[in-house]
């Protein structure tokens, strides 16, 4: 299966992605992470109004194979969470970069927050180095 890495996104080495539109960030997990986890069975996300701090876990995702913490690429306040994905996490795999988003966050300092993220090209290169995808 050919994995997609949309060019308009930024990625973390822990496999979360961010799409920034002004001061609003959409956060999700990459197709690679979903492929590695397998069938998703549980998703825990923060509540609307909660604060996120870049580098600190904001929730977890579990599959039949593993459980992983989720990390925000940015700091900010949760303004929306994808309730449908909490109810049926297995459908995240159907469209991870579209309907499978996890959170929307109002970012405190959009220009400063993305410096530790990877471009699609760099993310793919990292994965090729690790896994030979």
Swiss-Prot record:
GO cellular component terms, alphabetically, are: cytosol; glycine cleavage complex
Source organism superkingdom: Bacteria
Q: Which cofactor does it need?
A: (R)-lipoate
Q: Which residues form the Lipoyl-binding domain?
A: 24-106
Question: Which keywords fit this entry according to its UniProt record?
Answer: Lipoyl
Q: Which CDD domains match?
A: GCS_H
Task: Give a GO biological-process term.
Answer: glycine decarboxylation via glycine cleavage system
Q: Extract the InterPro entries matched here.
A: 2-oxoA_DH_lipoyl-BS, Biotin_lipoyl, GCV_H, GCV_H/Fam206, GCV_H_sub, Single_hybrid_motif
Question: Is Thylakoid a UniProt keyword of this protein?
Answer: no
- Decide whether keyword Nucleotidyltransferase is in the record: no
Q: Which residues carry this modification: N6-lipoyllysine?
A: 65
Report the PANTHER family cross-referenced here.
GLYCINE CLEAVAGE SYSTEM H PROTEIN (PTHR11715), GLYCINE CLEAVAGE SYSTEM H PROTEIN-RELATED (PTHR11715:SF3)
The record's function comment reads: The glycine cleavage system catalyzes the degradation of glycine. The H protein shuttles the methylamine group of glycine from the P protein to the T protein.
Q: Which family does it belong to?
A: Belongs to the GcvH family.
**Assembly, per entry:** The glycine cleavage system is composed of four proteins: P, T, L and H.
**Protein name, please?**
Glycine cleavage system H protein
